[in-house]
């Protein structure tokens, strides 16, 4: 079988959870930046939505991080990413969906406010306050969900942990780290794993992307859940400013 190729972007939480899974399973792969640069066109050709991460194995193309993890677990089942118990498996999948939608949208939009200057100041302030309150709520709920367990799937490292980790690392980098001791201890345990140490990113990559956006050489994607969150947060004027500047996209076109 040909070497797997992962089209990704280092700061994408969706790509990060896939990379952790690949490394925990000891599956070799090549990485390509699929968001900007020469490989972005390949992603648009291979994926109807032009989204990363995208996993390519010979003629097999797998898109969407959740589906990629399903594929990896079916093709390389050891070690498994989900518990054996059906109820725990359902809980793990629900947590992954929560991370991929609500929590991702919160941190994505907070990052946009912190490192761009789109829209009027009052709208930006409203979104920042809404986002900080949402993040605090999510962190408290995650701490309750973790409890005294070592991992979110109990005694085993699984896809729930891989889904939560990128967001909690991002909150720490953005100086909005969780206050709960059990969640912080879990974060330290996870970051000590070799599979995680290799995917941690600094803000430099995000700042470089924002510089490309300002220069007009890159456009950010407003996925549906991010757009819904921004409008609920009172950011309609910010969206209008971005559309006027033509620095976002809603689809491949």
Task: List where the protein language model places each region.
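GST-like domain detector, emphasizing the conserved glutathione-binding G-site
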Residues: 1-133, 228-253
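Juxtamembrane helix-loop transition sites at the ends of transmembrane segments
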Residues: 29, 115, 182, 196, ...
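Generic structural signal for helix capping and beta-alpha/helix-loop junctions
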Residues: 39, 207-208
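Generic structural signal for individual residues within well-ordered alpha-helical segments
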Residues: 44, 90-93, 163, 184, ...
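Acidic/polar loop patches that form or flank catalytic/metal-binding clefts of enzymes
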Residues: 81, 197-199
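GST-like fold's C-terminal all-alpha helical module
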Residues: 99-194, 202, 248-253
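Exported/periplasmic ABC-transporter solute-binding proteins
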Residues: 202-203, 227
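Long, charge-rich low-complexity segments
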Residues: 208-241
């Amino acid at each position: 079988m040909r070497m797997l190729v992962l089209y990704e972007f280092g700061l994408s939480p969706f790509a990060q959870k896939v990379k952790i899974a690949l490394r925990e399973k000891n599956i070799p792969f090549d990485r390509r930046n699929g968001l900007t640069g020469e490989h972005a066109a390949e992603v648009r050709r291979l994926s109807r939505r032009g989204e990363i991460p995208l996993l390519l194995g010979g003629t097999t193309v797998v898109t969407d991080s959740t589906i990629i993890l399903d594929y990896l677990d079916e093709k390389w089942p050891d070690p498994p990413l989900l518990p054996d118990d059906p109820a725990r498996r359902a809980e793990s999948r629900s947590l992954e969906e929560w991370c991929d939608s609500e929590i991702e949208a919160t941190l994505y939009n907070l990052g946009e406010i912190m490192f761009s200057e789109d829209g009027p100041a009052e709208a930006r302030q409203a979104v920042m306050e809404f986002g900080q309150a949402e993040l605090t709520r999510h962190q408290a709920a995650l701490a309750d969900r973790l409890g005294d367990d070592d991992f979110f799937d109990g005694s085993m490292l699984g896809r729930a942990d891989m889904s939560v980790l990128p967001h909690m690392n991002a909150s720490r980098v953005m100086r909005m780290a969780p206050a709960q001791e059990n969640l912080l201890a879990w974060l330290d345990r996870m970051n000590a794993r070799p599979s995680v140490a290799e995917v941690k990113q600094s803000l430099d990559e995000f700042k470089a992307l924002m510089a490309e956006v300002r220069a007009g050489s890159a456009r950010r994607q407003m996925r549906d859940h991010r757009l819904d969150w921004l409008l609920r947060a009172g950011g309609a004027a910010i969206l209008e400013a971005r559309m006027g500047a033509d620095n976002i996209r809603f689809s491949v076109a």
